[in-house]
Design a protein with these regions (language model features):
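Short beta-strand/loop motifs in extracellular/secreted proteins, especially
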Residues: 53, 63-65, 107
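Beta-strand-rich interaction surfaces with strong enrichment in secreted/lumenal proteins
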Residues: 43-45, 73-77, 87
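N-terminal edge beta-strand
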Residues: 27-50
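N-terminal signal peptide c-region/cleavage motif recognized by signal peptidases
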Residues: 21-23
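Extracellular/periplasmic metallocenter environments
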Residues: 27-32, 79-114
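Hydrophobic helical h-region of N-terminal Sec-dependent signal peptides
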Residues: 11-15, 19
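Bacterial N-terminal signal peptides that target proteins for export
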Residues: 2-11
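Asparagine-centered strand-capping/turn motif at beta-strand->loop junctions
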Residues: 57-59
Length: 114
């Protein structure tokens, strides 16, 4: 059995960690990509290097699409008329291609970290 004073201390520690976590995420810069007519807009997205970013992918099409990148090690299906959040980085300076696997002929783009 855990003494009540230890339980209170653990509860305070867990609560403090939970309250501190959202502020760390809020400090990350956010960028938006829109999927429209099976294309990513913008096709090229410039982001800061060495910084973790929040990427908001909005699918304006009625059909699902995927945000996928081998170089970023990310794969996320976004249902039609919805959005998803993908966290990326920190990235070394460079170019990172991404694509939509369901419409590979048109859904292409790249992230440039500078």
């Amino acid at each position: 059995m855990i003494p009540s004073s230890l339980r209170r201390g653990l509860a305070a520690l867990v609560l403090g960690a939970a309250l501190a976590a959202p502020s760390a995420v809020a400090d990350e810069p956010s960028f938006e990509l829109v999927i429209r007519d099976h294309k990513f807009e913008p096709e090229t997205l410039e982001v800061p290097a060495d910084t973790r970013i929040k990427l908001i992918v909005q699918n304006a099409d009625p059909t699902p699409e995927e945000f996928e990148s081998y170089e970023l090690n990310r794969e996320k299906v976004i249902p039609g008329n919805s959005q998803a959040i993908v966290y990326i980085g920190p990235l070394d300076p460079g170019t990172y291609p991404f694509f939509g696997e369901f419409h590979m002929d048109t859904a292409q783009g790249r992230i440039i970290a500078e």
